[in-house]
């Protein structure tokens, strides 16, 4: 069941509607900073500390996230495994991956169609906001 989209005032370059996002990141400081930055941009945020928690939230929401923003390299279940499982359950699911490792970016290429982009770490909060806005704009 899709959620209701609420319009809000925007500044230039900002996505015009609030989106429901899931941030999956094992580093608590990165997870918290990204969540705050995206909340300030007007989005509703859920967070998970690893891919297993992320997949559980995706299942509970019945795939109802506009975008999942996930680290690739995490304990328990990594972002690639989570993306594959989420795509099998919800083929329309779109995921933006983050990584600090060049070799992990290559692993993401096998998920074309599910992965909308890979953000290289470290990144600024402005960069992550801009990449999320670009990813969301692709689906408007």
Where are these regions (language model features)?
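Charged docking surfaces used in two-component/phosphorelay signaling
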Residues: 32-40
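Acidic catalytic/metal-coordinating carboxylates
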Residues: 50-53, 78-82
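Receiver (REC) domain active-site loop signature in two-component systems and cognate sites
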Residues: 74
């Amino acid at each position: 069941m899709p959620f209701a989209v609420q319009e809000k005032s925007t500044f230039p370059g900002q996505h015009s509607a609030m989106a429901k996002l899931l941030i999956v990141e094992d580093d608590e400081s990165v997870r918290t900073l990204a969540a705050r930055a995206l909340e300030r941009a007007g989005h509703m945020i859920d967070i998970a500390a690893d891919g297993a928690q992320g997949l559980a939230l995706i299942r509970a929401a019945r795939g109802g996230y506009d975008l999942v923003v996930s680290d690739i390299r995490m304990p328990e279940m990594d972002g690639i495994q989570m993306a594959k499982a989420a795509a099998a359950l919800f083929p329309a699911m779109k995921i933006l991956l983050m990584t600090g490792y060049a070799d992990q970016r290559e692993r993401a290429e096998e998920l074309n169609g599910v992965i909308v982009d890979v953000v290289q770490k470290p990144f600024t909060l402005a960069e992550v906001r801009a990449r999320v806005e670009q990813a969301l704009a692709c689906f408007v």
